[in-house]
Amino acid sequence: MKFFVSCAKGLEYLLADELSALGLGKATATIAGVNAEGELEQALRIVMWSRLASRVLWPIDEFECPDEQALYDGVRALPWHEHIKPEMTLAVDAHVSGDKITHARFAAQRIKDAIVDRMRDEGLERPSVNTDLPDVRVNLSLRKGRASLSIDLGGGPLHRRGWRGAAHEAPLKENLAAALLLRAQWPRLHAAGGGLLDPMCGSGTLLIEGALMAADVAPGLMRHGSLPPSRWLGFDKSAWKTIQSEARDREAAGLAALKPVIHGSDIDPTAIQAARENAEVAGVAHAIRFTRADVADLAAPEQEIGAVVCNPPYDERLAADPALYRALGNALQKAVPQWRASLLCGNDELAFATGLRAGKKYQMFNGALECALIVCDPIAVPGRDPAQPRELSEGAQMVANRLRKNLKKFKSWRAREDITCFRAYDADLPEYAAAIDVYEEDGGKRRTFLHVQEYAAPAAIPENDVRRRRNELLAAAREVFGVPPEQVSMKSRERGKGGSKYGRFEQRDEFIVVRENNALLQVNLFDYLDTGLFLDHRPLRRMMAEQVRGKRFLNLFCYTGVASVQAAVAGAASTTSVDLSATYLQWCYDNLALNGQGGNQHLLVQADAMAWLEGDRGQYDVIFCDPPTFSNSARADDFDVQREQLKLLRAAVARLAPGGVLYFSNNFRRFKLEENAIAEFAQCREITARTIGPDFERNARIHRAWELKRLG
């Protein structure tokens, strides 16, 4: 019987070899799978033993299918009572390609309808639907007007081994992990007494899969347990029991002989804990040594030969950084130069960044992400000292030169004004369109962090060029500032967009303390688009701090309260900070406490600033108002700074004490101040030029600012 075994793209030839090793006489690689020929018992053996397959599809019919009615009629014509009992549950997976039936979910529903109607034709009850754990899973492949119906013998995706419990970020599917191990020739190296190493092990997928492979544990044993994978009426239960019994015998012998030659490390303690828990469930914890360590501190295992398998971060969500790949390549050359490596890199640029010489390179897909798998044997690169950094590309060198030029230009200004947080680069080279902000940590560690915000590239720029330039920019920044990858935050940001303070990027909850204008401040460089400190307002905050000693200060739309904190440190008699966000008010409270500025004189108010102004009757000597461009919070009326400016400024000016001053600023680039209307209640003059520091002179439209005083 001819049947189909599917797999991820890029694994087809490996799968064909695996099926041949399992005894299939005919196994021909095709797109995303293998066309196989054999008996049902052989197909069931694949369900139990294949480490690479996604599904094993046993055909039950094939027919012409020009349209939806033909699909329904063809399915209804089949004797479904010979495949499923009424009390069983059913699921249908559909994969369609054509111009008449284009929606897989619609096709799956029509198949379910046809099966149910045929069962009723036979005088039987309709089977129920269970999309997660059905008794029988039917598969449709519709291509070029021809429908192929199959039974999914495994009952679902075969990459699920049954041990995964504690998932870490972006886990690798087990069948792709098996492919990396096979490309690294791990079975051969293990048989020769070699070791296995993953220096960025995450939740342990590669190492656990390697341990199960070394112990000869069938992938289907834990996945299916004591039950058969399918209750299809054509399923050969006797053959399955025999296959299962053989697998259990081999598992017992293999686990007993498995030695602790597998090593995993990761800088994230949560990942290490997840890996240990997963290994325990899989029954291979005794064979794997997990340690928390940075890749730069990689220790050499005791085995002289072995395989390195690694899936370093490479998608935008995980902030791929070529410097991290360079550190990985250097560490491997130092620790295990004679080992073989199989590294799944995000693209050719990141593979190149490792500095390793790939003997072979394969195209693979991790889900929808196209990746480059490089195989190095041995890891050592003749004539290269891993301690020496790899030369920057021409583009990266251009960025590095501009960064050094800017740092030289800012040197005297930074020394004179004690500037430790500043913008070092703002799309100075148009093709490298990003902003690079520097944050120097205060206190004992004195680490330097980089906050890189990439502006959205025009749609006409090819994605490969965008990715290459991003990697070159990061490489240059890392080189110039000498910072490790964990101290670089990479984000993408569209030009000219107002608001957007609130989207979450990561969940590191890592704060560092920096200093500005004599105040200590907590910033979070990784979790949100903005950091808690708007660097462009530094001169304006300094200007206000110089005026507030012994005075009452009001901060509207206060965000994290930086201006309030600096006013308190400068000796303000009182500060009042108003914001709708409890998160930002807590941040403000923490910033005040960090500077020893507690007490009732520093008031935090959670409220809509517009509504609060209408009810407040206090008087203030200095008011700072920096509203968002737009706001549509569920807890307050919609806000538009252009539309609401008169109402806002009239209410704020009304709160000024005699001789008081209001500083109004916003970053809406198309903002137009209604000067004539404002002149009826306030003296107003623009002071933008005084509020732009040297580091923002290239982008003088980053914000605008005005000074307002009450008439009379």
From Swiss-Prot:
Annotated PROSITE patterns: THUMP, UPF0020
UniProt keyword Methyltransferase present: yes
THUMP domain mapped to chain residues: 42-153
GO CC annotations, alphabetized: cytoplasm
Major localization listed first in the record, in broad terms: cytoplasm
MF (Gene Ontology): 23S rRNA (guanine(2445)-N(2))-methyltransferase activity; RNA binding; rRNA (guanine-N7-)-methyltransferase activity
CDD domains cross-referenced by the UniProt entry: AdoMet_MTases, THUMP_AdoMetMT
A Pfam family of this chain: RlmL_1st
InterPro entries to which the protein is assigned, alphabetical: 23SrRNA_methyltr_KL, DNA_methylase_N6_adenine_CS, RlmKL-like_Mtase, RlmKL-like_Mtase_CS, RlmL_1st, SAM-dep_methyl-trfase, SAM-dependent_MTases_sf, THUMP_dom
Subcellular locations according to the entry: Cytoplasm
Family: Belongs to the methyltransferase superfamily. RlmKL family.
Matching HAMAP family: 23SrRNA_methyltr_KL
Function according to Swiss-Prot or TrEMBL: Specifically methylates the guanine in position 2445 (m2G2445) and the guanine in position 2069 (m7G2069) of 23S rRNA.
Protein's name in the database: Ribosomal RNA large subunit methyltransferase K/L
